[in-house]
Amino acid sequence: MIITWMEEFGVLFVKAFLSLLAIMNPFSSVPVVISLMNEYSKEEIRVIALKASVYAFFILTFFLISGDLLFRFMGITLPAFKVGGGILLFLIALNLVQGEVTKEKGKAHEIEAALRRDNIALIPLAMPLLAGPGSITTVLVLRGYLNTLEGKVALFCAIFLSSFTAFVVYSLSTFFYRVLGRTGINLITRISGILLLAISVQFVVDGLKNLLKH
């Protein structure tokens, strides 16, 4: 029984983690991170990266915990949200495949405002770069899919590991940019977009199936 539970947990965790990592895609934000923190020391960059990942973790965890309450309060059914969320993720994925990251990853005025406020860990690094509309939608839709105890735990662990991955990438942003270059980052972004396209289509298909049953 324990082995079966672990196998089920592992499958759910991998599905949730890959979905979240595809939409968060911290590698695509590396050029933005470098431009924001080019005058900071390595220690300061690590501190800011840690704060940004912690902020993103708590934002996404909040929506994981409060998902049912939000749906009831707004009068939204899960199938309807699957369709709407899937369409939103599909549009975001198209931008990723086409290499148009900045449209979803933060506007120029948000970056300038962050520099003026010296609060880049929260805006734009944590939100919208990591915990933007796409990530929040993914958490809410996955929450409906993984509607068991092991599913909820798997999604929580996926949020934690995705946030930790973002911390590592942001902390080593200069290294990754030097190793991967613009071409490598664009390639990772497009691969993430293709994966997200498949996930978003599945969300829409499942949502439509559930709606047509009623």
Curated annotation (Swiss-Prot):
The keyword Ubl conjugation does not apply. It comes from the Bacteria. GO terms for cellular component: plasma membrane. The chain crosses the membrane at residues 17-37, 47-67, 73-93, 122-142, 153-173, 185-205. InterPro entries: Multi_antbiot-R_MarC (IPR002771). Belongs to the UPF0056 (MarC) family. This is UPF0056 membrane protein aq_540.
